[in-house]
């Protein structure tokens, strides 16, 4: 099992992935005007690829969604990285909102 983060992603976005026995899971996070855009892609060694795209308007809904994802148990390091990177992006979004209001 491995976990990777893409440091070459554009500012305001993150790409994370983990590979295990059953295949690979990838997440793409990006700040957007309305909150946080998330893509979740599951790439099994056999079978169909699954992709979800979701936009969250607040951090609490994202955290609930993230904590209900099975990766929490299958790839705990990816889960921790996903929460940490999302928190950083939410913080960047809050800072941008605060500076535009001044």
Predicted regions and their residues:
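Amphipathic, interaction-prone secondary-structure segments
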Residues: 12-42
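Mixed-charge, Lys/Arg-enriched low-complexity segments
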Residues: 1-8, 45-102
């Amino acid at each position: 099992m491995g976990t990777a983060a893409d440091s070459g992603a554009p500012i305001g976005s993150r790409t994370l992935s983990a590979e295990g026995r059953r295949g690979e899971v990838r997440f793409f996070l990006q700040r957007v005007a309305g909150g946080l855009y998330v893509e979740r892609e599951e790439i099994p060694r056999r079978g169909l690829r699954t992709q979800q795209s979701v936009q969250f308007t607040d951090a609490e809904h994202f955290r609930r969604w993230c904590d209900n994802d099975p990766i929490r148990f299958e790839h705990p390091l990816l889960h921790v990285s996903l929460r940490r990177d999302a928190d950083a992006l939410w913080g960047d979004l809050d800072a941008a909102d605060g500076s535009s209001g001044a």
